Structures are given as C-alpha cells and as structure tokens.
A protein has these predicted regions:
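N-terminal Rossmann-like NAD(P)+-binding domain of SDR-like oxidoreductases, especially those catalyzing
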Residues: 1-192, 232, 242, 271, ...
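Glycine-rich Rossmann NAD(P)(H)-binding loop
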Residues: 7, 94, 191-196, 218-226, ...
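Hydrophobic "lid"/C-terminal helical patch
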Residues: 17, 238-242, 268, 327-331
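Glycine/proline-rich active-site loop of Rossmann-fold NAD(P)-dependent oxidoreductases
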Residues: 167, 185, 192-205, 212-214, ...
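A conserved structural motif in NAD(P)-dependent oxidoreductases
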Residues: 229-233, 322
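Non-catalytic, hydrophobic alpha-helical segments
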Residues: 234, 238, 253, 264, ...
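Mid/C-terminal beta-alpha module of Rossmann-like enzyme folds, strongest
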Residues: 244-296, 308
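Conserved small/polar residues in nucleotide/adenosyl-binding loops
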Residues: 334-340
Length: 340
C-alpha cells in the first residue's frame, strides 16, 4: 500500500485532494495528513473520512523539523504532496513575515526530511519516491496583452510578498532537483474554486455576502483577469503528475477560463437569482446594487492566464468542469440547508 504524506490537508485544496484520492483509490492507498490548523484549516472538511483505517491526521507545523522528521521515521512515506502554505495576498501585504516562515522555511524542512528518509548511501534515492510541490501562477507576475500566457519557461516575476514566498519555495525545490537529483515535481496552478474554500477568497466571499445582502467589494475597476479552475480538476492534475509526470519537471495547471473579476461577480449573482426559489427571502437580497468599488490592492497583478499545453501533452490531463457548471455546483453548496 502506497503511503502519501499530504501537508495542509485540512485546507481548501488539500482537503479536496484527499477526498479525490480516496474516491479514486479507496483502500489501495494510505494518507497521512499533516496540518497546523491555522484559521484556513478545518477538519470538518474531512469529517466523512476521519474514521478510515487508511487515514491519519497529525497536527503539526511544517516548520517544526522534529515533528516532520518523526513522521518520516515512523512511516515509510512514498509520496509527499506539499500544499501547506499561507496563501492570501492581502494578509501577506500586512504581515509578510509569516509567509516567508511558512512558505519558504517550511518547504525547506519538508525537503530535508524527505531527502534524509529517501536518500541511499550512494547519493541516489529509493525507487518510487516522489515529492510534489504545489505552487501558484502568481510567481510569474502579470500579463498585459490579450493572447499572452504563462508557460513553464516564463521567467519568475513575483509582485506580492505571497508570490515572492512561493517563488522562493519553488526555487528551493528546483535547487534540490538540480543539486541532488531529488525526485520531485512542481505544479503551478491558476485560481481554484469549489467546496471548502475559506470565505475570504473572492468566489465564496461574493456568494456569502450576496446571500446576506452585504456589500460586494471590487478592487479598482474590476477588470483584473484570473484563470479559474474547479478544485477537483486541480486534484486530478496533481495525481496525474504524480503518476505520469517526468521527474524534475514543472507542470502548469490551468483551465482556460479567463474572467474579469467583475464578470465573476455578475455570473454569481445571475446564478444565485436563477437557483433561489420564489419566496426565499435571500432572492430579494441578491442584487447588482451590492457591488461596491474599493481602492485597488497594492501591487495588484492585472492578468493571469495559464497555458496547460505541457501537462495535456505529456500527462494527458484536461479540465472536466466547465466554469458555469462549477460555479453552479459551488453556489449550490452555499444555498443548501447545510452549506459548506
């Protein structure tokens, strides 16, 4: 039975990945979930799998080398999937220190622990081991022209403390691959949405606020463009890179769903209006009048767009969820009697 060590598995993408893996592999794998349980981590995301015999939760900080080394000493870890990170740009602007500590130093701890556990006396590594570092398209900076895309060869140009910390962690992983031939991959993904996302992020924030008749804040002119990917498609991509990706390679994961932020808000409002039944008091609250333009974020990148050609051609991955369908599924979670 292959054992996966998943960091940050109580967070948004990590918990969706764990659900995806158990749905696909059931009892063929074992997952050890390591999470510090910061504000963005929630074990309720994993309530329905917590009693599985092939699932273990360990509350630990990835910056705690002793705790991480102990996990490797007590378990034969085959794969590491490293999600754990501070990820909110606004928070990084106010407090960059924690982003550098968690995203950079935490990644270094994970790399050193895996290297120590997997390295053989001759400097090679045990067969079948792999470390997958999950990163973001924000490390590439901003695109100005329509038709431009981020490729794996695009130079890094981070503009926020968050993206700088992720770029630094990417470079650490790359340095271990280059220096030690450490068995790893890096994935850089576009914006995710779907179940279990923390409500400070754009899509859940807009859905929650609209249903409560609260202001819908829009940075600047609202025309900043992001490429959106349903989170289960991201989980599928990570699994496929683990299984089929060439060692030492980086793979971009994107959905070719480029939308302006203001377009996202209008799509959500239209979807909620369509979904809410007549007589539901929330239907009257959902209105374009709630849209409020606010001062733009410092260093706000104008446009992100991923070219996923490499992962499609080499690994066979493709996104299955159309944006409109994914938004509808996400809105349904928040309008149901037991919203996630």
């Amino acid at each position: 039975m292959r054992t996966y060590l998943v960091t940050g598995g109580a967070g948004f993408i990590g918990s969706n990945y764990i659900h995806y893996m158990f749905k696909k592999y059931d009892n063929e794998i074992r997952i050890i979930n390591v999470d510090k349980l910061t504000y963005a981590g929630n074990l309720e995301n994993l309530k329905d799998i917590e009693d599985r015999e092939n699932y273990t939760f360990v509350k630990a900080d990835i910056c705690d080398a002793d705790a991480i080394n102990k996990i490797f000493e007590e378990n034969e870890i085959d794969r590491v999937v490293h999600f754990a990170a501070e990820s909110h740009v606004d928070r990084s602007i106010k407090n960059p220190d924690v982003f550098v500590k968690t995203n950079v130093l935490g990644t270094l701890v994970m790399l050193n622990a895996a290297k120590a556990a997997w390295e053989l006396p001759d400097g090679t590594f045990k067969e079948g081991k792999k470390f997958l570092h999950v990163s973001t398209d924000e490390v590439y900076g901003s695109l100005e022209e329509e038709g431009e895309y981020f490729y794996e060869t695009t130079p890094y140009d981070p503009h926020s403390p968050y993206s700088a910390s992720k770029a630094s962690s990417d470079m650490l992983v790359k340095s271990y691959m280059d220096t030690y031939k450490f068995p790893a991959n890096i994935t850089n993904c576009s914006n995710n949405y779907g179940p279990y996302q923390f409500p400070e992020k754009l899509i859940p924030l807009i859905i929650n606020n609209a249903l409560q008749g609260k202001s819908l804040p829009v940075y600047g002119d609202g025309k900043n463009v992001r490429d959106w990917l349903y989170v289960e498609d991201h989980a599928k991509g990570i699994d496929m890179v683990q299984e089929k990706g060439r060692l030492f390679e980086t793979y971009n994961i994107g959905g070719h769903n480029e939308k302006q932020n203001i377009q996202i808000i209008h799509i959500i409002l239209d979807t909620l209006q369509e979904m809410l039944p007549e007589g539901d008091p929330r239907k009257e609250l959902v209105s374009e009048k709630l849209i409020t333009y606010v001062e733009d974020r410092k260093g706000h990148d104008r446009r992100y767009a991923i070219a996923p050609d490499k992962i499609k051609e080499e690994v066979g991955w493709y996104p299955e969820t159309m944006f409109e369908d994914g938004i509808r599924l996400t809105c349904l979670l928040y309008t149901s009697p037991s919203p996630r």
